[in-house]
Amino acid sequence: MLHIYNTLSRTKETFKPVHAGEVRIYVCGMTVYDYCHLGHARMLVAFDVVQRWLRASGYAVNYVRNITDIDDKIIRRAVQTGRRMHEVTDYFIAAMHADERALAVERPDHEPRATAYVGEMIDIIGRLEKNGLAYQADDGDVNYAVRGFQGYGKLSGKSLDDLRAGERVAVGSSKRDPLDFVLWKSAKEEEPPETKWDSPYGFGRPGWHIECSAMSKSLLGLPLDIHGGGPDLKFPHHENEIAQTEGAFGGTLANIWMHCGPLMVDAEKMSKSLGNFRTIRQTIAQGEAQDGEADYQANPREAEMLRFFIVRNHYRSPQNYTPDNLVDAQNALDRLYQALANVTPDVAGIDWNEAQAQAFKAAMNDDFNSSGAVAALFELAGQVNRERDSRAAGQLKALGAVLGLLQQDPAVYFQSSTRYSSAGMQQGASQMDAARIEALIAERGQAKLSRDFARADAIRAELRAAGIELDDKPGGMTQWRRA
């Protein structure tokens, strides 16, 4: 039975879809004005794993991930580069799809562009106005009257009083309340014509939040089974989505809300101002990815390493990007592939009665705990290495496929060079050096102190697959030996 952590209730809940056997998922996607960065990679891979597991569990999944193709940042990019808005968005959508292919992220069932749903957005604004939740200000903008919606803040846990204390009304603002947010932006004379739509409120364009309310309702209906997104979307974007959709139609927008954890760079938030901003293509391109070319050739070994780096951590846990962590991920993935290189897999399919398949299933049914699932993969790799067991190798490859991993031919995989492999590392599992073993043991100790037992188990399994046995002693000490 599947259990999912619900951001709304702040608890794990037994998953019960609205319609038996069917799952409707809406995930907030990209605003396409630049290349996708590593934080985007985490969101893309995390929800790809979610939909893969739901399908593997027998559900009929309708997965929608939108594209925001009208936004102030897009308009600025178009003006700065002398291009039309759709030229900017078409280019970066193509670039995003190139990143997804490299990371083995499956395309969603629907990938709506916001500009195709402006009519539906205007309809929702009209409903909100009729319900007393929207008003047109003196400057022509249409704003949402936040205090008119009972329950605002229920997702983020923020009270109106707390929000009010941190807000200030901008000079010249015609909002009735500083908490109000824009639903429809009135057109400015200097803005390009293609950014303006006619409406009952005059020419203008939609606000960001209203876009997702329109697309999710139009494509999936209400309530959604699952609504997901990145960690920074909980407030205000998702909070505002709830206010819009429920304020317009009543009922519930989504039964379960999922948010993946942040991806940090050297323990700091990734930002261009800090100089630690890194795109997906910078990380995995074969050679230098050329600016101005949406498509690129990814290094297949490095690309799967980046996916593995994300999958080996629980989707809700914070994740830290460092060069050393990528080396660690590459070495670990190499060990899984080495097990498959040593023994030809029996391709009979998954035997769900087998112990490690059961462990894998239990982990994934526990809030999509891919870290625990990866631990099961390392247990199987250890079995393959010890026993030269072709059925275990088949299980390893088949379960890896559920996570979008281990589908390359091992011989071809190892023919690709990698920038993220330890100097002098031998491919054989038994060649892990003492310094690396001690580092993993220290990381395991920290994981246990943080009560991240899935990660601790995954490290033990990884070491066992490399032929390293651990012996935990009283007082927190751990000794190791080569098997």
Curated annotation (Swiss-Prot):
KW Membrane (keyword) present: no
Residues annotated as binding ATP: 272
Taxonomic superkingdom: Bacteria
Biological process annotations from GO: cysteinyl-tRNA aminoacylation
Alphabetical list of Pfam families matching this protein: DALR_2 (PF09190), tRNA-synt_1e (PF01406)
GO cellular component: cytosol
Cofactor(s) the record lists: Zn(2+)
Enzyme type, top EC level: ligase
Catalytic reaction(s) noted: tRNA(Cys) + L-cysteine + ATP = L-cysteinyl-tRNA(Cys) + AMP + diphosphate
Gene Ontology molecular-function annotations: ATP binding; cysteine-tRNA ligase activity; zinc ion binding
Keyword field: Aminoacyl-tRNA synthetase, ATP-binding, Cytoplasm, Ligase, Metal-binding, Nucleotide-binding, Protein biosynthesis, Zinc
EC numbers, comma separated: 6.1.1.16
Binding site for Zn(2+): 28, 212, 237, 241
InterPro entries given in the database record: Cys-tRNA-ligase (IPR015803), Cys-tRNA-synt_Ia_DALR (IPR015273), Cys-tRNA/MSH_ligase (IPR024909), Rossmann-like_a/b/a_fold (IPR014729), tRNA-synt_1_cat_dom (IPR032678), tRNAsynth_Ia_anticodon-bd (IPR009080)
Manner of cofactor binding, per the entry note: Binds 1 zinc ion per subunit.
Motif ('HIGH' region): 30-40
'KMSKS' region, short sequence motif: residues: 269-273
Cellular compartments annotated: Cytoplasm
CDD domains: Anticodon_Ia_Cys, CysRS_core
Entry's family note: Belongs to the class-I aminoacyl-tRNA synthetase family.
Assembly notes: Monomer.
Protein name, per record: Cysteine--tRNA ligase
